[in-house]
């Protein structure tokens, strides 16, 4: 599936790992039913791949992966994570899945302290596991874990070994988020050069706040698949955010994605509700303040033409525009908010209301529309339409 996405294509696959890497974050433990509910929403959203889980990790993961495959497998590619060994691969096969994500680390620090293996042994594992999965008819995506801290020559050798064994896709994980966009671009360009037209994917963590930027840099270097999570949830500082990556690819670079962007906000809120992880107030695209305005100059501009202070419309991502009241407010925004409540004031009355609002705000009080309405009623000299 997805092989039509060539290196020279303007199409980019969205590989969602909310249900696998996202759920690995401490404190996030989803039931099978909750995972299925999110999977349905992701399929509805239009992601190309759903990483349903790690079937060999637990019976619950096995059952969830199987159930997700049954529920949405006819709409979207469902993939399961597996270590590079036959036992894990067999367990994944037992779910009925047709796609597998095989990984083994390649960095010296992982080889020495975690795997206790030599580079030669790792290369053998890569070949054997990928070949075994291919011999069982699976679509195989291979990831060299901790790729960005791996000696580059050895990384390229590991990638080439996976391709020789039959891997369909190569995913490059920035496992601990140590890349910056310029360096990651160069690395992905080198990986693309040895992949023989196979799809290259990127998987970026956000330890330095660069997961989205690095993901975009990877695509600019030739990657045609991006691993993401809804709201950027995941281990430590999280993963590349689905909503940020999708909108940056589409609006800033002109790439094609299958995502129904008007469903981004509702998907974000569903994941937040089920995981118990709140969406940051200032979160790009789906945050409550992503399209919020208070400053008088900004509000005036947005009222006249939203593009003056918004790069995209909130409707495009299913979000909402919010005009706030406070010490930075201006008369145009106040007038619009009051008229939406059926209150029509002249300029003198509006200025009196605005002065009262600013006094309250400067004293640390929160001013909402109801408060503004009360003030307006007190100072109004006209009939109020309510």
From Swiss-Prot:
It is an enzyme of class 2 (transferase). One of its GO terms (molecular function) is metal ion binding. It holds the Pfam family HMGL-like. Its EC number is 2.3.3.13. Pathway: Amino-acid biosynthesis; L-leucine biosynthesis; L-leucine from 3-methyl-2-oxobutanoate: step 1/4. Its cofactor is a divalent metal cation. Keywords: Amino-acid biosynthesis, Branched-chain amino acid biosynthesis, Leucine biosynthesis, Metal-binding, Transferase. Transmembrane segments: none annotated. SUPFAM superfamilies: Aldolase (SSF51569). GO terms for biological process: L-leucine biosynthetic process. CDD domains: DRE_TIM_IPMS. Residues 12-265 form the Pyruvate carboxyltransferase domain. A divalent metal cation binds at residues 21, 203, 205, 239. InterPro entries: 2-IPM_HCS-like, AIPM/Hcit_synth_CS, Aldolase_TIM, IPMS, LEU1_arch, LeuA/HCS_post-cat, PYR_CT. It catalyses: 3-methyl-2-oxobutanoate + acetyl-CoA + H2O = (2S)-2-isopropylmalate + CoA + H(+). Homodimer. Catalyzes the condensation of the acetyl group of acetyl-CoA with 3-methyl-2-oxobutanoate (2-oxoisovalerate) to form 3-carboxy-3-hydroxy-4-methylpentanoate (2-isopropylmalate). Carries out the first step of the leucine biosynthesis pathway. NCBIfam families: IPMS_Sufob, LEU1_arch, PRK00915.1-2. Belongs to the alpha-IPM synthase/homocitrate synthase family. This is 2-isopropylmalate synthase. It comes from Sulfurisphaera tokodaii (strain DSM 16993 / JCM 10545 / NBRC 100140 / 7).
């Amino acid at each position: 599936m997805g092989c039509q996405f060539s290196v020279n294509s303007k199409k980019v696959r969205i590989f969602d790992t909310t249900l696998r890497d996202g759920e690995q974050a401490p404190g996030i433990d989803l039931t099978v039913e909750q995972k299925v509910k999110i999977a349905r929403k992701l399929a509805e959203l239009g992601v190309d791949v759903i990483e349903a889980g790690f079937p060999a990790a637990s019976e619950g993961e096995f059952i969830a992966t199987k159930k997700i495959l049954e529920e949405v497998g006819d709409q979207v590619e469902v993939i399961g994570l597996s270590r590079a060994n036959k036992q894990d691969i067999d367990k994944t096969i037992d779910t009925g899945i047709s796609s597998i994500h095989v990984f083994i680390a390649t960095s010296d620090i992982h080889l020495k302290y975690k795997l206790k293996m030599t580079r030669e042994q790792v290369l053998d594992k890569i070949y054997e596991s990928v070949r075994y999965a291919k011999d069982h008819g699976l679509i195989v995506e291979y990831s060299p874990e901790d790729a960005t801290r791996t000696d580059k020559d050895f990384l390229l050798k590991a990638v080439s070994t996976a391709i020789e064994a039959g891997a369909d896709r190569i995913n490059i994980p920035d496992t601990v988020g140590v890349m910056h966009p310029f360096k990651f671009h160069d690395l992905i360009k080198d990986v693309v050069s040895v992949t023989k037209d196979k799809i290259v994917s990127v998987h970026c963590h956000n330890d330095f706040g660069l997961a989205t930027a690095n993901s975009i840099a990877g695509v600019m270097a030739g990657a045609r698949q991006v691993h993401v999570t809804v709201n950027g949830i995941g281990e430590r500082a999280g993963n590349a955010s689905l909503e940020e990556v999708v909108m940056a690819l589409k609006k800033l670079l002109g790439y094609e994605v299958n995502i129904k962007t008007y469903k981004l906000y509702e998907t974000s809120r569903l994941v937040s509700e089920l995981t118990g992880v709140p969406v940051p107030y200032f979160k790009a695209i789906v945050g409550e303040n992503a399209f919020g305005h208070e400053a008088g100059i900004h509000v005036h501009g947005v009222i006249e033409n939203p593009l003056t202070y918004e790069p995209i419309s909130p409707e495009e991502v299913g979000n909402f525009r919010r005009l706030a009241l406070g010490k930075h407010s201006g008369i145009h925004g106040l007038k619009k908010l009051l008229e939406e409540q059926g209150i029509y004031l002249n300029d003198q009355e509006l200025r009196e209301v605005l002065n009262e609002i600013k006094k309250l705000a400067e004293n640390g009080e929160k001013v909402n529309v109801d408060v503004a309405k009360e003030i307006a009623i007190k100072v109004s000299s006209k009939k109020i339409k309510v």
